[in-house]
């Protein structure tokens, strides 16, 4: 199989990740629940992974990183734990449903919501953020990179608007963590939500969020913590405040190994390889008659994503043909990005998304281009 669905999850993981998970499953106890070797091993692994993520994102320290199951859980924690009825929030049409649906839920309860629109290339106007601020605005919530077009947002520019108005800035880094340099303090990011199974090259079922010192989030969950057992309420200090119950220690072990691999390989090296593959694919397919490509490719400093359609064919049928006839894995449909599809005019047809990993090859790109040429010629 030629795997071009890396924006959904990276299928190929570094060997060190698999080895770390396997070892943890045979030796790891429950962190904070004992003083035996298994429990202490779990605590060390979890701390070391926190520290590695804190360094990766430029956080103040390991205690600012809390683990979750994925970015959806992290975003729900951030959005529902920070906002309340009467608050006003600014977001964009680029967002995934893991941002939109929690915001819609709060809007139904009395929160005010402004969604900044996107143009036909999937871009937003940055001046709109400043103009959308109201006296009761509490936060700005945006993605870093669109999971449909691959377009990037300028986090530092948006963060400066948030900081100037005393707003909290929540970022969904699902598509960019592990590939693009993110410095939460330089970019004025207050909460950064991430998942481990995409660009971070870790296992599924592990993610997390960075929370800036001074930002308090109402926990979604409370319960076992391993510390301060006699408190009636869940301990308030980070990261314990956001980590009720047993953590996914095995997943954290794999994520820690993945972050080490990323740092040793170099984010620049990984990103440049992915973008080179994307550029080669884009330059070839945009010349095929009957192919429509979505997104802004005026700059190749973007996520390694190319979404397209073949003539007026349903995207699901094209993706199925690529899989069945050519062994190429892609993602069709709406990609949990309804507002972006409306902006692009692809609500009915959807789109076929190709997303690349640095483990992909130039030969795989050539095979995919040839397959699309054949499909575009079919009657």
PLM region spans:
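Pyridoxal 5′-phosphate
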Residues: 1-379
């Amino acid at each position: 199989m030629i795997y071009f669905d890396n924006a959904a999850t990276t299928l190929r993981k570094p060997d060190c990740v698999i080895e770390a998970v396997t070892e943890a499953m045979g030796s790891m106890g429950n962190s904070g629940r004992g003083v035996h070797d298994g429990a202490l091993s779990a605590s060390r692994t979890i701390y070391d992974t926190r520290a590695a993520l804190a360094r990766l994102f430029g956080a103040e320290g390991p205690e600012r990183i809390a683990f979750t199951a994925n970015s959806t859980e992290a975003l729900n924690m951030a959005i529902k734990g920070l906002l309340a009825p009467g608050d006003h929030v600014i977001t964009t049409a680029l967002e995934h449903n893991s941002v939109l649906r929690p915001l819609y839920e709060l809007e139904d309860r009395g929160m005010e919501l402004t969604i900044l629109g996107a143009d036909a290339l999937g871009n937003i106007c940055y001046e709109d953020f400043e103009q959308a601020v109201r006296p009761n605005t509490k936060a700005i919530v945006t993605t870093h990179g669109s999971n449909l077009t691959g377009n990037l947002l300028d986090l530092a520019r948006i963060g400066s608007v948030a900081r100037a108005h005393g707003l909290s800035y929540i970022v969904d880094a699902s598509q960019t963590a592990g590939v693009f340099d993110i410095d939460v303090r330089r970019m004025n990011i207050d909460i950064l939500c991430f998942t481990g199974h995409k660009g971070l090259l870790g296992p599924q079922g592990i993610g997390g969020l960075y929370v800036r010192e001074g930002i308090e989030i109402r926990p979604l969950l409370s319960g076992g913590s391993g510390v301060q057992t006699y408190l009636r309420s869940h301990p308030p200090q980070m990261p314990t405040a956001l980590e009720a119950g047993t953590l996914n220690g095995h997943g954290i072990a794999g994520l820690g190994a993945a972050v080490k691999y990323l740092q040793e390989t170099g984010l620049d090296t990984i990103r440049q390889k992915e973008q080179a593959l994307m550029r080669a694919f884009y330059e070839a397919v945009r010349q095929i008659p009957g192919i429509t490509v979505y997104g802004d490719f005026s700059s190749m400093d973007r996520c390694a994503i190319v979404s397209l359609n073949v003539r007026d064919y349903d995207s699901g049928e094209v993706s199925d043909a690529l899989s069945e006839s050519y062994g190429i894995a892609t993602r069709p449909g709406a990609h949990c990005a309804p507002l972006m599809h409306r902006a692009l005019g692809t609500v009915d047809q959807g789109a076929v998304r190709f997303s690349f990993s640095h483990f992909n090859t130039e030969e795989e790109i050539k095979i995919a281009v040839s397959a699309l040429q054949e499909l575009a010629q079919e009657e």
